[in-house]
Amino acid sequence: MKKIFLLVLLAVLTACGPKKTEQQVAKPESNEAIFFVGTYTKKEGHVDGQGEGVYVYSMNKKTGAISYKATSDAVISPSYLAVHPNGKNVYAVNEFDGGEDSFAAVTAFEYNPEDYSLAYLNEVSSVGQYPCYLSIDNSGKFVMAANYVGGSVVLLPIIEDGMLGNYSSYKKHEGGSSHPRQDAPHAHQIIQHPRNGLVAAVDLGADKIYAYELDTVGQTLNYLRDFINPPRMAGPRHIVFHPEKDIVYVLNELIGTIEVATFSDSLRLEQKVQMIALQENGDDREPSGAAIKIHPSGQFLYASNRGEINEILAFRIGDNGELIKIGAYPSQGKTPRDFEVDPSGRFMLVANQDTNTIVTYEINQETGELIDTGYIEEVPTPVCIKFLGQ
């Protein structure tokens, strides 16, 4: 009888004790990192698009091997992507020409981790043609997009359930330069500085990088000044801010260089520190810089060079932000349009747009060197890679 009483008492105490919530229950860490791949779905002058939408893949965190999971609802050429910090929404530019009476678009998706599906939510006008880049502001309330043709940038509010609202602010760039591809402005990137909140818009056609202020209350982009004026005919394509230092790295597509500069908190240029070439002296092949990224550690910088070269360049970042070349590595395909370092910093995935492959490299954490893993995955016309949670 005493034994029964003790068992009943134990059961009552257990039932009355604190219960672990779903958040408190320890879950084993997944061995897969989810990432999304933007593609071209139609033939354009510079590419034979063979994709069917945005692709969802997983990467093995231990080996770097990748495997297909799902394809999004069909949309036209979702070439460049942005993943919302909420881990739920993915946004894509629809890179096409809407015609004389219309514009291209930006699409919102919802990601379901249970079945890896990417469901279409809505799309809105990009207020331009051939949008080629987009990013999410620091507050998570806006998508910012760059229209290559027409040379404009646009601010799109994120509304209920992750859908996009119509544009709240539009800025058109002016001017051009001397290269045949610079007959007009061609906006190629728009990003917000992670600390001071100011916005930089890169224009390949105008040879300019503009500084804007984002007014989240008024929902507007307000021009402040020309931030950086690269050399004539440089064709600035993308920039990347150092995660800790007030240093910016400018990838000049047309002349194949990276320019290193320091700036103030108000995005005022202070000093141009270095100009380093993607190719060795005497290499007369035409350069075509594409993507530029900094390793999560802040110690290394990488850039891709397309055209005849098809390489990934690796650099060590010095104490003053200067770049010291580590080496050049074959992309193992044609046109490395983009690459991405996974959030852990251990692996790099390279998207070879014109040979339909994604290649996995391992990154030496001490030296920044790239190590071939042997993993190559066939993916139709990959243009952009974005990891979930990055």
Mark where each language-model region is.
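C-terminal motif of bacterial Sec signal peptides marking the signal peptidase cleavage site
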Residues: 14-15
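Beta-rich, blade/repeat-based domains predominating
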Residues: 75-85, 127-138, 174-196, 230-247, ...
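Asp-box/WD-like beta-propeller blade repeats and closely related beta-sheet repeat scaffolds
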Residues: 116-189
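Short loop/turn segments immediately following beta-strands, especially the blade-tip
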Residues: 57-64, 108-116, 155-166, 212-220, ...
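Beta-strand-rich domains and repeat architectures in extracellular enzymes and scaffolds
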Residues: 26-60, 70-85, 189
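Short glycine/acidic-enriched loop and turn motifs that connect beta-strands
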Residues: 41-45, 95-100, 149-152, 206-208, ...
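A short beta-strand motif characteristic of beta-propeller blades
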Residues: 67-73, 119-124, 175-181, 223-229, ...
